[in-house]
């Protein structure tokens, strides 16, 4: 399940709370993964800590990954990987194993794996 929602303020706040996350977890098949946008780690570390605190109430495995988003504030955006059955490393391995390499101007398997390598300050946001 991929959720590209609005920011966690006002009417969108419910999309960043444990009840919604638990509903999504219940909808996943065995081995399923839930991903949601989780804000700019440069601008909103406290919001991210709150997001992961709520995610931990619904999922056993969490991880942050980053992507360059030039149209977003700071150009760096975070996303939350969540599952009750699959760890982040297993997800990376599964993605690499289950796909054929394709030639693009940007994406490659190494970049995919590297997206999950976080600066220490961002790791602390996830682990708080």
State each model region's role.
Residues 2-4:
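A conserved beta-strand element that flanks and buttresses the S-adenosyl-L-methionine
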Residues 7-8, 39-44, 70-71:
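Short "lid" loop at the C-terminus of a central beta-strand within the Rossmann-like core
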Residues 8-16:
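Glycine/threonine-rich flexible loop motifs
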Residues 16-30, 56:
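A short glycine-rich, Lys/Arg-flanked "PGG" loop and its adjoining helix->strand segment in the class I
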Residues 31-38:
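Conserved beta-strand signature within the Rossmann-like core of class I S-adenosyl-L-methionine
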Residues 46-59:
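Short alpha-helix
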Residues 53, 74-128:
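SAM/dcSAM-binding transferase cores
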Residues 60-70:
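Conserved S-adenosyl-L-methionine
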């Amino acid at each position: 399940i991929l959720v590209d929602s609005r920011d966690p303020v006002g009417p969108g706040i419910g999309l960043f709370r444990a009840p919604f996350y638990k509903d999504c977890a219940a909808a996943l098949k065995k081995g399923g993964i839930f991903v949601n946008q989780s804000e700019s780690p440069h601008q909103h570390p406290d919001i991210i800590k709150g997001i992961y605190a709520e995610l931990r109430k619904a999922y056993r495995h969490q991880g942050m990954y980053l992507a360059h988003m030039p149209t977003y504030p700071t150009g760096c955006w975070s996303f939350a990987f969540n599952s009750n059955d699959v760890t982040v490393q297993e997800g990376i391995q599964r993605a690499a194993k289950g796909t054929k390499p394709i030639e693009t101007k940007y994406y490659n398997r190494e970049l995919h794996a590297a997206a999950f390598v976080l600066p220490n300050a961002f790791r602390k946001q996830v682990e708080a």
